[in-house]
Amino acid sequence: MATINDNYLKLKAGYLFPEIARRVKTFAEANPDAKIIKLGIGDVTEPLPEACRTAMIKAIEDMGDRGTFKGYGPEQGYEWLREKIATHDFQARNCDVDASEIFVSDGAKCDTGNILDIFGKNNKIAVTDPVYPVYVDTNVMAGHTGEVNDKGEYEGLVYLPINAENNFIAEIPSQKVDIIYLCFPNNPTGATATKDYLKNWVDYAKANGSIIFFDAAYEAFITDSSLPHSIYEIEGARDCAIEFRSFSKNAGFTGTRCALTVVPKTLTAKASDGSDVELWKLWNRRQSTKFNGVSYIVQRGAEAVYSEAGKAQVQALISFYLENAQIICDKLKGAGFEVYGGVNAPYIWLKTPHNLSSWDFFDKLLQTANVVGTPGSGFGAAGEGYFRISAFNSRENVLEAMKRITSQFHL
């Protein structure tokens, strides 16, 4: 008889965002005239940059001609895109990253989960709390944890609390961990990391033989020139870190799907016999076996991000969403909310008013203002009493949402 992966049974009921969608659907069906504004899931609203659209249209025409038609592409991504990424995103910041170390994929979310395929089951995993739920859930699915406890924490994971007291920056653990998830600018809190802070993590990882999974999906929103965009801006990071990036939020590719993972060829981990194994070789083998590459059309669109027109259009998108974030911060602070993030990041992290739980505030906001956000507790036990609002929406909707919220809550 066929059996299942029992680890899936450990998962808490419902992934965060489907649960939000379920509650919103129930409310909308009961209140068909309500004009709901969604500032919850981090999905973009503005159109793809013209440079990307033009390149993709040209690529479609390429597919209509036998001479330029493309079938299966390289699983790692086309060389012309990987070279552009290496030059503009890394080498321009003095990061020692070669095009051959870049793997183009269909999403950073996929890669942060799939990367576990090349790691053993006995690694001690550290995550911040609150944290992007995918990091935790994929480790549960892979059998790297025990059962969930009454606090909503999984046995076997090391949770590093981030809160207002430590400026939402996790402290280096006193114990040894093998894999560390870091996300900066941070989802969900909007916190950022300095070079000195990341250097502490790199030093820790090198001293303990640990690997850092660095999620830089929101690096394009950094406007402070002193802040690092990549873990590879830190000396020694090539020997202890894998970086994940995405075109989703900077170029609006959430529905188009294109991302990348950097695995340095100098990066190694231990085999069961104690020998050092190059992780690049394992990830290359994994991708060649389980992934057929991102479509030619999409990769041409991603390549256009690095054209002069593409750069300007992407920057305009980023500035638009950051202006939304500024509006949200200003309006909520003016109404008396305790607000964090929203600077160098597209997410605003706020303390729920009147000691409401995260989900109670979600329901109250939906019912009274018809606005959707994300309960902080959905990102972990330490997120209880907090709430995330996304800057990814139209200006009209952001202004209307702030008008509704501040009319219902003035603290």
Swiss-Prot record:
Which Pfam families does the UniProt entry name for this protein? Aminotran_1_2
Per the record, the pathway is: Amino-acid biosynthesis; L-lysine biosynthesis via DAP pathway; LL-2,6-diaminopimelate from (S)-tetrahydrodipicolinate (aminotransferase route): step 1/1
Q: Which residues carry this modification: N6-(pyridoxal phosphate)lysine?
A: 249
On the tree of life, the source organism's domain of life is: Bacteria
Annotated GO biological processes are: lysine biosynthetic process via diaminopimelate, diaminopimelate-aminotransferase pathway
Binding locations of pyridoxal 5'-phosphate: 72, 108-109, 132, 187, 218, 246-248, 257, 292
UniProt KW keywords: Aminotransferase, Pyridoxal phosphate, Transferase
- Reply yes or no: does the keyword Transcription apply: no
- Please state the Enzyme Commission number of this protein: 2.6.1.83
Q: Output the Gene3D superfamilies linked to this UniProt entry.
A: Aspartate Aminotransferase, domain 1, Type I PLP-dependent aspartate aminotransferase-like (Major domain)
Q: Which cofactor does it need?
A: pyridoxal 5'-phosphate
Extract one GO molecular function annotation from the record: pyridoxal phosphate binding
| Functional note | Involved in the synthesis of meso-diaminopimelate (m-DAP or DL-DAP), required for both lysine and peptidoglycan biosynthesis. Catalyzes the direct conversion of tetrahydrodipicolinate to LL-diaminopimelate.
Q: Which family does it belong to?
A: Belongs to the class-I pyridoxal-phosphate-dependent aminotransferase family. LL-diaminopimelate aminotransferase subfamily.
Q: Under which name does UniProt file this protein? A: LL-diaminopimelate aminotransferase
State which gene encodes it: dapL
